[in-house]
Amino acid sequence: MNLGKIVQVIGNVVDVEFGEGKLPPLLTALFVSNPGLNDQEDNLVLEVAQHLGDNVVRTIGMDLTDGLVRGMPVKDTGNPIMMPVGAAVLGRVINVVGRTVDGLGPVNTDTYMPIHRTAPAFTEQDTSVKVLETGVKVIDLLVPFPRGGKMGMFGGAGVGKTVVMMEMIHNIAMQHGGISVFAGVGERTREGNDLYHEMKDSGVLPRAGLVYGQMTEPPGARARVALSALTVAEYFRDVEGQDVLLFVDNIFRFTQAGAEVSALLGRMPSAVGYQPTLGTDLGELQERITSTTKGSITSVQCVYVPADDLTDPAPATTFAHLDGTVVLSRQIAELGIYPAVDPLDSTSRILDPNVLGEDHYYTAREVQQILQKYKDLQDIIAILGMDELSDEDKLTVARARKIQRFLSQPFHVAETFTGVAGKYVKVEDTVRGFKEICEGKHDDIPEQAFFMAGGIEEVLEKAKQMSAA
């Protein structure tokens, strides 16, 4: 075994000296026993980041380095960080180096994969565009997800990003038998804990793997945890031929951790203090998230926008990789309409008649036109009231309010809070329902019947009950 010894510790950066001609390559994982963490052997993983000369390598710690002293022996593993993969990972919470943090013992598997891999070659990639049905009406109608695509989810605190995410994990697991991988990158520990328990209670956990690198972790772990989670997803795609959903919350923290690591390694910062390799770092991660001829990874990434500045280098670089954006709006949440997706701000690359078909495309555009008209009329309504509108505008407003309410939907994962059974709505039923509203077939039905309903049949049933009462 190739052994080295620690020669310098500066915070999270550890320099290790090896024998002549024995230097481990860049990105190799090294093991060291740190008594400051616990009394287990090889409990700290270091990743080689630079070769300094004089047989010394500079490494970044994947955990706290308090307790390390000069002269400690370091083992060269000969590999990058190796992640446990396969069915044994499902239902478990693991950290950046593949060790469990849920207190249920180690992952029981013999299959491991390195976290640093090249993106699939052009010849292996699947270029056909297919739609991934989520069962969430507003997303399937207005922001269709491309299979193997990347969607960004933008929203402030408390508008329901996590609930929408969990519903998608539930629907993919229940309807498609699909697998989900969740990467908590720079997450609040409390949120990660809540998500684990909510998924456990709603029965989704056995079809999902959770990989966490929380805010308390050093930057090395936060800069690598997204790659660790992606490796778990890649195994299901490449070896088992599955369609996998990869959730990353939050992709900004990945960039932020990269900037911290870059500063620790003494690299010259670029604009706004970010790392000079910002585009490369993000590109290496995003290019691995794709469809191949074997299976697909569809990714939903929460994007934090610093100071609401979309021109900040971190979100601006992320935008270049996304196929669409789901914008969650506080104004819509205030109306009590959940999921609080903004139908006019959200966009998808595949909202196109050649992909979705004429019927779906024109229904989606008609819905957006009616909602936009209603938005334009709201100032007049606020000042003069509904009575001053023309008959045509009154009809538009009535339909828009019905559409707005029909875009709400009871979720399976929220059943415990709402007491209303969750609904999965197929794309064709969604399109048919909205088309009928736009055509005026349901102008006589009260708008309250459309609120928190599944398909249009349920609306008609509700309306019957309301008229009978």
UniProtKB/Swiss-Prot annotation:
EC main group: translocase
UniProt keyword Cell membrane, yes or no: yes
Entry membrane topology: Peripheral membrane protein
Entry EC number(s): 7.1.2.2
Record's keyword annotation contains Transmembrane helix: no
Keywords tagged on the record: ATP synthesis, ATP-binding, Cell inner membrane, Cell membrane, CF(1), Hydrogen ion transport, Ion transport, Membrane, Nucleotide-binding, Translocase, Transport
InterPro entries cross-referenced by the UniProt entry: AAA+_ATPase, ATP-synt_VA_C, ATP_synth_F1_bsu, ATPase_a/bsu_AS, ATPase_alpha/beta_chains, ATPase_F1/V1/A1_a/bsu_N, ATPase_F1/V1/A1_a/bsu_N_sf, ATPase_F1/V1/A1_a/bsu_nucl-bd
Compartments it resides in: Cell inner membrane
Domain of life per record: Bacteria
A GO CC term attached to the entry: proton-transporting ATP synthase complex
Pfam families from the UniProt entry: ATP-synt_ab, ATP-synt_ab_N, ATP-synt_VA_C
Main location: membrane
Binding site for ATP: 155-162
Catalytic reactions on record: ATP + H2O + 4 H(+)(in) = ADP + phosphate + 5 H(+)(out)
NCBIfam families tied to this protein: atpD
Function: Produces ATP from ADP in the presence of a proton gradient across the membrane. The catalytic sites are hosted primarily by the beta subunits.
Subunit record text: F-type ATPases have 2 components, CF(1) - the catalytic core - and CF(0) - the membrane proton channel. CF(1) has five subunits: alpha(3), beta(3), gamma(1), delta(1), epsilon(1). CF(0) has three main subunits: a(1), b(2) and c(9-12). The alpha and beta chains form an alternating ring which encloses part of the gamma chain. CF(1) is attached to CF(0) by a central stalk formed by the gamma and epsilon chains, while a peripheral stalk is formed by the delta and b chains.
Family: Belongs to the ATPase alpha/beta chains family.
HAMAP family: ATP_synth_beta_bact
Protein name as annotated: ATP synthase subunit beta
Native source species: Syntrophobacter fumaroxidans (strain DSM 10017 / MPOB)
UniProt gene name: atpD
